[in-house]
Amino acid sequence: MTKRHSGTLSSSVLPQTNRLSLLRNRESTSVLYTIDLDMESDVEDAFFHLDRELHDLKQQISSQSKQNFVLERDVRYLDSKIALLIQNRMAQEEQHEFAKRLNDNYNAVKGSFPDDRKLQLYGALFFLLQSEPAYIASLVRRVKLFNMDALLQIVMFNIYGNQYESREEHLLLSLFQMVLTTEFEATSDVLSLLRANTPVSRMLTTYTRRGPGQAYLRSILYQCINDVAIHPDLQLDIHPLSVYRYLVNTGQLSPSEDDNLLTNEEVSEFPAVKNAIQERSAQLLLLTKRFLDAVLNSIDEIPYGIRWVCKLIRNLTNRLFPSISDSTICSLIGGFFFLRFVNPAIISPQTSMLLDSCPSDNVRKTLATIAKIIQSVANGTSSTKTHLDVSFQPMLKEYEEKVHNLLRKLGNVGDFFEALELDQYIALSKKSLALEMTVNEIYLTHEIILENLDNLYDPDSHVHLILQELGEPCKSVPQEDNCLVTLPLYNRWDSSIPDLKQNLKVTREDILYVDAKTLFIQLLRLLPSGHPATRVPLDLPLIADSVSSLKSMSLMKKGIRAIELLDELSTLRLVDKENRYEPLTSEVEKEFIDLDALYERIRAERDALQDVHRAICDHNEYLQTQLQIYGSYLNNARSQIKPSHSDSKGFSRGVGVVGIKPKNIKSSNTVKLSSQQLKKESVLLNCTIPEFNVSNTYFTFSSPSTDNFVIAVYQRGHSKVLVEVCICLDDVLQRRYASNPVVDLGFLTFEANKLYHLFEQLFLRK
């Protein structure tokens, strides 16, 4: 492209530079038509209607994804309670909470916000939160764990809820960069950063639940998953003791005399067991190769945001931990891409719209084993972490290298910062911004910010000023009043728009140039097919004159505006009037010639997203059915339970229930237990706090809200807390059924079953 020499503007004096390089780094045609959609265009050709259809489809997927996310969260919560309900071990108040969750209306009705003045203030607040990610980044790092899921839902599905809109996607990625950078700088153990249950890992996991990520998983894993699911009775468990018991139960092997004392090592030497493991390993590897090949061959389909996060992880690791090996960095990236993104979909395919119903036990175990093999390959530990027959190790090693090559290539994507700058300018200057949120989501965001306000932002910050005017947050409204409102975003401080003039990256010249290109493409689409002005090489003044001659006042104005833009660009020396207004003419020609190909690409994208939308709607029906089943359970259980004032009495201790008797329970519902007690009962497995000593430390446990707990560690004689962590009951329940039932909270490690029973004894039966 020829260098453009800019003239002098009142705003700044630009250097002689290659303008609009940012548009060279992305498909500018798509951008132009996004802009075109936001303008009240006179063009309503087939391209316009197709692009509008695609735009609406993306909006529907974004909206439905949020609704499914909320449903999945509540199904998980109710699923964790259903066992207690069936066993008649749920207190009356918990049953009321259970019933409330079942009666919630998941299809929020649109309405209006009850206070117009506060609506404008909230519009200014959410404008700041959306356009300046630093505010949310500070909040995410400090919010209490029991508020984390609610905050992430609002961030991912409301504040940045347009999941296919580049500006909001790039702002969200900017948020990730801020949070991850801070976490990487603060950690001493980078290897566990993305594997432990931290705010960062939960944020990244929630991000993968958005529409683009789920669409990708469906496109590459659907067939693989269903090829496994069509064989519900196929046994492919390769754990030696499990294989041994299967062979004994089916009469293929006589039981050993010391059957209950056998170990994995011993039974793995039995010829029948060894042969069975070898046969099953061969089948497992064949299936696993299909999954891996599907992922390895799909790098160009992986959403940009997922790849950019992988790039960010690699860059941060290289900068802050330069001595870490490349294979370890690949393992770190695999801790996000496979552990948080791909493998959860394999383990629970029904939650990712990959199966229409729950898999059989055999299929579930097979998929879990496949996911485990894939993760060990990504971690570079396939030779030590699987029970596969040793003869298959060379093939696993070969795939380790292939997977690591993929993990290296994932980060080979460009940055978005210049594109975001232009998107910000266009969004803030050319269209009204708005969010759709429920009343309670607005109030909850207000409450969370207010709780953390003094520790987050400068007292003179704009957020502080708005919160002072808003005052205390309102209490949540009943579900019937929790309507969905449109929240117009209000740019109260012009300085919040990116300082384009200072950075000299996107300037007035850039915007004029983009406007001109957009307008001339639009004019070409207005002219009849075969019109002389549409023939290449294009004559831009002829195009403008031809449209001006059409019998329409609005079209005449467009033609005049096109001539004015050419004159202005020529005066600014951004185009060469003596050389056919180059380089603008060449760019318009290229975009015009590529219209047919672009039309086909958009049609293919629309068709693919229609399939995704159908799957999301089907999954919504499945989740609604689950809630109906839980409702039946609740009604049945309630009919059998007689009200009692001694809910906590009469429970016998089951196997593994801890026998700790707390020394004192404070009025604030805080329980104090010694480290020795917790160690003796094997509740506490490990503590890596530097100041920790079993003899002179103690723990406090509290439950600030239903199913959320705070654990704090103190030194005797000191009031300052050494470590304080928050954990929700769902996380403990999930770890109880893991192969290694351990709850890792960073400095503290607990046995999941013992910790659950401790919570049950102290809080859940009250």
Curated annotation (Swiss-Prot):
SUPFAM superfamilies in alphabetical order: GTPase activation domain, GAP, RGC domain-like
Gene Ontology cellular component terms for the protein in this record: cell cortex; cell cortex of cell tip; cell periphery; cortical dynamic polarity patch; cytosol; division septum; mating projection; nucleus
Domain Ras-GAP, chain residue ranges per copy: 170-410
SMART domains listed in its UniProt record: RasGAP
Cross-referenced CDD domains: RasGAP_GAPA (cd05132)
UniProt keywords, alphabetically: GTPase activation
Membrane-spanning parts: none
Site note Arginine finger, residues: 195
GO biological process, one term: positive regulation of mating projection assembly
Molecular function GO labels: GTPase activator activity
Keyword Glycoprotein assigned: no
Function statement: Inhibitory regulator of the Ras-cyclic AMP pathway. Stimulates the GTPase activity of Ras1.
Full protein name: GTPase-activating protein
